UniProtKB/Swiss-Prot annotation:
GO molecular function: protein-lysine N-methyltransferase activity
Subcellular location: Cytoplasm
Lineage: Eukaryota, Amoebozoa, Evosea, Eumycetozoa, Dictyostelia
Pfam families: N6-adenineMlase
The UniProt record lists the keyword Cytoplasm: yes
Function of the molecule: S-adenosyl-L-methionine-dependent protein-lysine N-methyltransferase that methylates elongation factor 1-alpha.
EC number per UniProt: 2.1.1.-
Descriptive protein name: Protein-lysine N-methyltransferase DDB_G0272708
Superkingdom of the source species: Eukaryota
HAMAP family, per database record: Methyltr_EFM5 (MF_03187)
Length: 211
């Protein structure tokens, strides 16, 4: 029997799967060591850590294996999902800040001013859960983000929107199915009145009018 180094090494399916999981876990670990600071010029204000963890848990609890998830302008929430390394979910980050391309193919450059650009055919009409925080507190921003949602969603898509309460009238105009949740997101550096709303009933998020 030849012991040449040119001989092919064939791994069993179990060994190959374990090796792939190892490399993926190492990739996740390296990506999550990359700290990205807020850029206020891009209207970036990270949530309190507990808020990011809570929302990520909501997404994980209220989706099922194989679901496609989009975090739209919510990189701090995406980071928690990514760190949790839930391989059952297809998590994607839509974000303007190209520093987040550290996440590789899961990063999708997103400019709300061009809400229909750069969306892959694989994601159009195929997203099960969208978590979003429009980058600016304006009607224009809500209107354009709503166009992006329309391209991504299907009839059963769950939406979770986090923003300033001042946007509620605009949200009702462009996303009329949304309901105000009991849960309130927190930002350590902002004093604005923040809230969240969803288009589905969530035991974890609650409903404001049922306090």
């Amino acid at each position: 029997m030849s012991d040449s180094s040119d001989d092919e090494i064939t791994l069993s399916k179990e060994s190959l799967s374990a090796l792939q999981d190892f490399y993926k876990s190492r990739e996740v670990e390296q990506q999550d060591k990359f700290e990205i600071s807020e850029d206020w010029q891009l209207s970036q204000f990270w949530y309190e850590e507990e808020t990011s963890k809570f929302v990520a848990n909501v997404i994980e609890q209220e989706t099922i294996g194989g679901n496609v998830v989009v975090c739209l302008s919510t990189p701090s929430i995406y980071k928690v999902l990514h760190k949790n390394n839930n391989l059952l979910l297809n998590n994607n980050l839509f974000e303007y800040d190209k520093r987040f391309d550290v996440y590789g193919e899961k990063f999708h450059f997103y400019d709300y001013n061009n809400p229909e650009d750069g969306i892959s055919e694989q994601l159009k009409g195929n997203v099960d859960y969208i978590c979003l925080d429009p980058p600016f507190l304006s009607e224009e921003c809500i209107e354009k983000v709503a166009k992006t949602i329309a391209l991504l969603r299907k009839p059963t898509t769950r939406l979770l929107l986090l923003t300033g309460r001042i946007q509620w009238n605009n949200i009702q105009k462009y996303l009329p199915e949304m309901m105000i949740c009991e849960f309130e997101p927190k930002h350590p550096r902002l004093q604005n009145d923040f809230f969240c709303c969803s288009n589905y009933h969530s035991k974890l998020l609650g409903l404001e009018n049922k306090k």
